[in-house]
Amino acid sequence: MYQMNAKMHFTFVFALLVVSFNLDVLGKNLKYRIYEEQRVGSVIARLSEDVADVLVKLPNPSTVRFRAMQRGNTPLLVVNEDNGEISIGAKIDREQLCQKNLNCSIEFDVITLPTEHLQLFHIEVEVLDINDNSPQFSRSLIPIEISESAAVGTRIPLDSAFDPDVGENSLHTYSLSANDFFNIEVRTRTDGAKYAELIVVRELDRELKSSYELQLTASDMGVPQRSGSSILKISISDSNDNSPAFEQQSYIIQLLENSPVGTLLLDLNATDPDEGANGKIVYSFSSHVSPKIIETFKIDSERGHLTLFKQVDYEITKSYEIDVQAQDLGPNSIPAHCKIIIKVVDVNDNKPEISINLMSPGKEEISYIFEGDPIDTFVALVRVQDKDSGLNGEIVCKLHGHGHFKLQKTYENNYLILTNATLDREKRSEYSLTVIAEDKGTPSLSTVKHFTVQINDINDNPPHFQRSRYEFAISENNSPGAYITTVTATDPDLGENGQVTYTILESFILGSSITTYDTIDPSNGAIYALRIFDHEEVSQITFVVEARDGGSPKQLVSNTTVVLTIIDENDNVPVVIGPALRNNTAEISIPKGAESGFHVTRIRAIDRDSGVNAELSCSIVAGNEENIFVIDPRSCDIHTNVSMESVPYTEWELSVVIQDKGNPQLHTKVLLKCVIFEYAESVTSTAMTSVSQAPLDVSMIIIISLGAICAVLLVIMVLFATRCNREKKDTRSYNCRVAESTYQHHPKRPSRQIHKGDITLVPTVNGTLPIRSHHRSSPSSSPTLERGQMGSRQSHNSHQSLNSLVTISSNHVPENFSLELTHATPAVEVSQLLSMLHQGQYQPRPSFRGNKYSRSYRYALQDMDKFSLKDSGRGDSEAGDSDYDLGRDSPIDRLLGEGFSDLFLTDGRIPAAMRLCTEECRVLGHSDQCWMPPLPSPSSDYRSNMFIPGEEFPAQPQQQHPHQSLEDDVQPVDSGEKKKSFSTFGKDSPSEEDSGDTSTSSLLSEMSSVFQRLLPASLDTYSECTEMDRSNSLERRKGPLPAKTVGYPQGVAAWAASTHFQNPTNNSGPPLGTHSSVQPSSKWLPAMEEIPENYEEDDFDNVLNHLNDGKHELMDASELVAEINKLLQDVRQS
C-alpha cells in the first residue's frame, strides 16, 4: 500500500504523438497519461518541445504562442501560452470524473497564435486509476434465514461490496470465515461486477445449532491491497412443507433505452401448492441489490410485476442484473430467488451535441475577430458528439450563414470555422452563423446552434472631409469671436479610432500666426474669428484644417483647405495725394495768359477700399459760381473754362469734393487756392508746383541720402590722407644734429648711403651744439610733460637764436662798413641788421663749405643715415632708418673729446696751417678759413677752393676738429627747376646767375635754421596765432622731443625774412615778396660757423647758463611765417 502511495507522488506520463490529417491548420494529436490525484501545478508536458518539428516550419517559431480551447468553467489542465507547458490546474479524481468507466481521459485543443499561421493540436490526457478506495458493503450485518430442510448446494445470493476503483484496484474476490456448513462462490455480473453466493455444503439441523455468524470479506487486487468485510448472521428455521418456486431461475430482458417509465418488464410467476397463508407469495428485491436497481426499477410485491421506474440510458448503463425473491406467508417460510438480467437496447434517442469554443473571452455565442485579418483566420472551434452508437452516433456538421466563413474538419467530430475572405467592419460589422449537426440514425436527429461573429474595428480609415476645399466669406469689421463656419470630417471607425479632433495648421499671414486670426473648436470643427478683419490689410485668408482621429498606435489624419474671403466695406474715405496739401489746402498757380481749356491741375486721390467702394468721382462744390473752371468727374482734371485775361479776379478758392461710390458714400473736401501770375513768374511757379506735386519716391530719397553720406565720407578720407601725407613729408627730413646726438645710444646697424634730400641743417648758436639728452624715460612719456619741458626752454632758445642771427649778419658786413645798432633788444638788432642786408650796404665775405670735417668724420656722417629720425620721404621707412631714435649721444660728443688738443702745438703756438684759426675754432671746430687762402677779391670765384666729398685731398690735415657745423644749403626739391644742386657740399651748377642765387638761398637756409629756434615750442605762445597756424604748429610739434630743435618746414625761413627784408625807413612799402620790390642781394653767403672770438672753451658751460637765464621778447609768429613764406617763394622764382 505504501509503495503505491509512493508512486502517486511523481507523474507517470507518456505521450503518444499521432500524425493527424493532412491539413494545413492541424498539427498533431497528442496523448498523455497521468495518474489521478496529482499535485496541482505538476507539469505534464511542454508543447514547444513536443511539436518542435511543426513549429520550425512556421515563419517565426520563436514568437509562437499557445492557447487552450477547453470546455468547462474550471479547467483541470492549464496551458502556458509562452511555451505550451501543460500542467494540472485542479485536483483530478478519476472516480468522480469517469466513475466505473474503464477509459477515462481529458480532451482539449490547443491552437497557436497568431492566427495567421494557425496550428491546431488535439490533446488527450488519460487519467489512470490508483487504488485509493477499499471495497465496502452496504450493511455491516447481513441477516440470512435458511430452513433446516434446505438441500445441500442451495445457493443464497449475498450482498455485493462496492469498490469505485477500476481494474485490479476494484473488487476482485470474496472470502468467508472458516466453518463446516457454508461456503461462498464469487460470480460476475453482466456489468462486470462481482458478487458472492452462499452455498450450503452440509445438512442443517436446527436442534443442533440454530444460527451461525460468519465474516464475509471483499478484497481487491490493487497495490497495496485493500479489503472490506461484513457479518453474515445465518438463522436456521424449522422445516416448511412447501416453498414458493419460480418458473425460471433467471430471466434476460431486452429494454429499449427510450422505453417510457412504467413499462412492464417482467411478470414474475411463482407458485406455492400450500393453501391459505402458507400458499400466499410476496415478491421483493433481494436484500443485497444495489441502490441504483432500487432507483431504476420497481416490483409489485403481490403480483410480481417488474416495471421501469426511471428512464434508462444505454450510453450510461448498458445492462442491469436484478435479484428478486418470492416468499410465502407461512411460518418458517423459505424464500425462493430468481435473477433478472435487463439489457438496454440502444436507440437513436440522442440528438447530436454541439459545443463552440471561442478564442476570445466573453459570451460563448459571440466570436470577435479584427477587420482586415487575412483569409483562413481562426474564428471558432466546433466540437460535435452523439451519445448514440453505430449510425445513430455518426454526425454530419454543416455551417450556414455567409460565404465569408467556412467550416473545416480537423479530426473525428472537431471542426474549425475560418474566414473565407478579408472582412471590412465598415461594410458589415456582424455576422450570424449557424452550425447544424445531424446524425445518421433512423429517423435522423439533428441539432442547430447559432452564434455571432462580431468584427472588431481597427484604425484603417482616416477622417474624411466632404470637400477638399471650402470657401467662405465674411465682412470686414466683424466682432472678435464671430462664428464663421463649420467644417466636418467623418471617420467610419469606432471608438477612439473614429473620434475626430480638428486643428488649424500653423501658417503666417503678414508675419502673424494664423492662430491669431482664426480658431477652431477641436471637437466639432466650428471656426471663429479672433480679431477684427480689415479688407485693406488682408483680403483673403487661406489656412489648412487638419482632422486627426484618436486611433492607436498610429493616428490617421486628413486635411482640407479653407479659403476665407474678407468682404470689403466702405470704411475708408478718399485720401488726396496730389497736389500737396497743407491744412487740407493747396495753392495752384495759373498764368495770366492761360486760354480756355488750360490744364490747371489734377487732383489725385486714392481709396484703400476696393471695388465700387474705391471708385472715386470729383466735383467742385463751391467757389466756381461763374463757371470759370470745369472738372472731369472721373479723372479729376481741372481746366479753365474761359481765358484768364478776361477774368477780373486774381485769386479763387475752389472747394472740391472727392467721394466714392460705396454705401454709404464717403467723401473728402479740399480747398484749392488758384492765383493768377504773370507769364514768366507763373511758369516758374507752375514748374515749382509740378515739382512739389510730384510724389516723393522713398527709394530715391534713400539712394540720394546714401550717396550723400558716401560722398562726405570720401571727402573726409581724402582730406585725412592728404594731411597725413603732408605730415609724413615734413617729418622725413634728415636732421643732422639730432641724429648726431642720438648716435651713441643705438646699436651698430648696417651702413647705408645718405642722400641730400634727407639732410636738414641745424645751426650752432654761439658755439654750442644741441648735445643734451634727447631721450625719454619710456616710450609712453606724457606729451603734456614734453610740452612743459619745451616751454621752459622757449625764452632761452629764442635768445640764443637772436644772438646767432646778429653774429651771422655781422660776419657778412665788410670791415670798412660802419655798423651802428641800437642794442635795445635782440629782436630790434636783428631787424636793423636785416634792413642793412636788404639795402645791400655790404659785400659778403667768402665762406668755404664742404671741407669742414676730416675724412673719418665724413665717413661717420655717411653712416649717420641709418640713425636718422626721419625716413627718406620716398615711401615706407627703409631698412636701417630710425624715425624715433632717442637716448643716444651724438658722435660729435665723441669728437669733442678726442682731437681738440691736437690742433695746437705743445708750446701753445698755432701751426702755420692754422694761422687763420680763431678762438671760435676751439668751440665750434675749424672752418674753411683755417686752411683755405682768402679770395683775391669779394667777387672772385671761390668755388675752385671747394672740397667735394669723396675726393682725396692730401693737403688736408688727417684730423679735423669735430665741432665744425655742417651748414649746407639744399636747393628745394619742389622747385620748378630740373637741375640738381650741389650747393650743400660747396658745388654749384655752372650757370652765370648761380652765384647770386646760391648766396641768397644759402642765407635763407641758414636764416631758416636759426629762425626755427625762434618759433615758440608750447601752446601758450601761440595764443595769437590763427586756428590754422595753431593746427600746423601742433602738427609740427609731434616729431621732436623736449630740449630738441623743433623741425619745421623749409619755408619757415621766411619767418624773419619777410618781416625784416623791408626798407627800415619805409615800413609801409611793399614787401620783397613781390616782383616790384627790391630783390635781396645775392652777393653774400652766411657764415653760421663763425662766432664771437671772446668765447673760450672753458666758458662753454657758462655761455649756456648765461643764455638760459636770458630774457627776450617773443615775436608775432603768425605774421613772420606768412611774410617769410612769401619771401622764399619770390627768391625761388628769381
Swiss-Prot record:
GO cellular component labels: plasma membrane
Annotated coiled-coil segments of the chain: none
Subcellular location: Cell membrane
Cytoplasmic-facing ranges: 721-1134
Membrane topology: Single-pass type I membrane protein
Cysteines joined through disulfide linkages: none
Keywords: Calcium, Cell adhesion, Cell membrane, Glycoprotein, Membrane, Repeat, Signal, Transmembrane, Transmembrane helix
Signal peptide: 1-27
Positions on the Extracellular side per record topology: 28-699
Domain of life: Eukaryota
Function of the molecule: Potential calcium-dependent cell-adhesion protein.
UniProt keyword annotation of Transmembrane present: yes
Basic and acidic residues composition bias: residue spans: 868-877
Subunit structure: Interacts with DAB1.
GO BP, sorted A to Z: brain development; cell adhesion; homophilic cell adhesion via plasma membrane adhesion molecules
Region feature (Disordered): 768-800, 868-888, 941-1003
Annotated Cadherin domain residues: 28-137, 138-246, 247-354, 361-465, 466-576, 582-697
Protein's recorded name: Protocadherin-18
Native source species: Bos taurus (Bovine)
Positions of glycan attachment: N103, N269, N559
PANTHER family listed in its UniProt record: CADHERIN-87A, PROTOCADHERIN-18
